[in-house]
């Protein structure tokens, strides 16, 4: 059952840097996730740049995300507060595989190309200005795909976590991914966890760290 799969999900603190999945294992996980999700008109107007095992680069990525987090706090008027490392980001430093999800330009498949030609419609996903107007839709679809990847990874005995604290400046990403064309939507890591975030919480913090209720999230009307 899907519940049993996702009950294993925990936010990673540190990945095991010795027990590293092979690229073939990761490719298998990514391949299995594709048919488990969906996209409007099968556009899949997104891609993930997969950064493989490289501890030096992973540490630089953590440093860059921490710097962005500190800068963001400064913009919120908290520049005088001390900068404390965020344990929620630590998984970036040891992740053997890091997926940088971004939008991508894409042409329609043969089926939808014929349909758009027949009705003289305009395909929106193959030019930058139209694509960026669809960022919300693309972000939702990335979320669906990345969650399926997490599920397959969990079923494979691995772990996966997410990060939303990073720079939105495209130029900041060129040193990591020279060919990147759009700012990231989300960062996802995959590997074998060595420790989890919940393990560093005090008993009081664990009690306070609650999920919203069903009443908070759903309203029957």
Q: Where are the model-predicted features located?
A:
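N-terminal amphipathic, basic helical "cap/leader" segment at the start of enzyme domains
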Residues: 1-108, 215-221
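Short, flexible, mixed-charge acidic loops at enzyme active sites
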Residues: 64-65, 111-122
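Phosphate/diphosphate-binding glycine-rich loops and adjacent basic-rich segments that engage nucleotide
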Residues: 199-221
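A short secondary-structure junction signal
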Residues: 110-114, 165, 199-200
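A glycine-rich helix N-cap at a beta->alpha junction
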Residues: 70-77, 176-202
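Small-aliphatic-rich amphipathic alpha-helix that forms the alpha element of a beta-alpha
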Residues: 29, 33-34, 99, 105, ...
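Generic beta-strand structural signal
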Residues: 95-97, 156, 184-186
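Short, cationic motifs built from Arg/Lys/His that form the positively charged side of catalytic pockets
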Residues: 9-13, 151, 202-204
């Amino acid at each position: 059952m899907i519940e049993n799969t996702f009950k294993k999900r925990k936010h990673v603190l540190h990945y095991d840097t010795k027990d590293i999945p092979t690229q073939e294992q990761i490719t298998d996980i990514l391949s299995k996730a594709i048919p488990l999700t969906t996209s409007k008109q099968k556009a899949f107007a997104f891609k993930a740049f997969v950064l493989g095992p490289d501890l030096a680069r992973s540490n630089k990525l953590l440093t860059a995300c921490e710097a962005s987090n500190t800068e963001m706090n400064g913009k919120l008027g908290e520049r005088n507060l001390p900068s404390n490392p965020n344990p929620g980001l630590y998984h970036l430093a040891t992740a053997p595989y890091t997926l940088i999800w971004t939008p991508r330009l894409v042409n329609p498949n043969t089926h939808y190309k014929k349909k758009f030609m027949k009705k003289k419609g305009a395909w929106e996903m193959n030019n930058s200005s139209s694509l960026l107007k669809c960022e919300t839709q693309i972000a939702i679809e990335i979320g669906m795909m990345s969650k399926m990847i997490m599920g397959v990874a969990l079923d494979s005995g691995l772990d996966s976590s997410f990060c939303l604290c990073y720079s939105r400046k495209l130029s900041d990403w060129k040193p990591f991914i020279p060919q990147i064309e759009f700012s990231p939507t989300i960062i996802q890591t995959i590997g074998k966890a060595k420790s989890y975030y919940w393990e560093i919480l005090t008993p009081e913090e664990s009690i306070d760290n609650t999920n919203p209720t069903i009443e908070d999230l759903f309203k029957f009307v």
